[in-house]
Amino acid sequence: MKQYIKLIKKIIRVGNQKKDRTGTGTLSIFGYNMKFDLKKGFPLLTTKKCHIASIIYELLWFLKGDTNIAYLNENKISIWNNWANESGDVGPIYGKQWRNWSTPEGHEIDQIKNVLIQLKKNPDSRRMLVSSWNVGDIDKMRLPPCHVLFQFYVFNNTLSCQLYQRSCDVFLGLPFNIASYSILIHMIAQQCDLKVGDFLWTGGDVHLYNNHIELAKKQILRIPRTLPKLTILKKPQSLFQYCFEDFKIIGYHPYPAIKGEISI
């Protein structure tokens, strides 16, 4: 994950000191791109240990179309607790928009299913996109989507995906985002009998929170290790039938975790 270390170094070197919604303050740059060849390994950060269970369960939660943290909490995942209301709901965020996008006419659109149909019937389509940024629902969301739009591309029977992320917490959030979408590419490739290609990541406001800067400086002193491999142990009948036990990470030997405070 040399790309990630390079990004941190750039933010520290040329970032702009900005105020932010949480009051913490950030060191920020605008516009950044990274590319990960999934054939060369699973891009799970090695310069600090990542909690892979949180990454997988969150992705499965999104794919269920769920917006209540009960499923996450049942599986001992607490990453969304700070944004849930008393009933455990976080509003119409990722899962709702991916699986049940509401139209002005009162219809619901399953964007993920539509992409799967296109990948199988018309893989050269330029319309294989999923958006989480439903303007009419933003005010109902406890936390508006940070990773807002992703698009699929097929060539030579190989599946690639590009993500646009409007706001990126580089120290805490970005390692999760990279791993999560890489897993999703593996899952969809398996379902559509495709090979995995590239994951391309584009960030808008890409930042280190001020209380993470010293932690990030510690992290960039660590030399990235060999990437692990992701194996999916079985092929369910549909994309929506995977469970946590279907995924195996092989050869993950990270440095110890570096804990940072979440800005809410």
UniProtKB/Swiss-Prot annotation:
Gene3D superfamilies: Thymidylate synthase/dCMP hydroxymethylase domain (3.30.572.10)
Main localisation: cytoplasm
Organism name: Buchnera aphidicola subsp. Acyrthosiphon pisum (strain Tuc7)
EC category: transferase
Protein name as it appears in the record: Thymidylate synthase
Positions of dUMP binding: 21, 126-127, 166-169, 177, 207-209
One example of a Gene Ontology biological process annotation: dTTP biosynthetic process
Keyword Transport: no
A molecular function GO annotation: thymidylate synthase activity
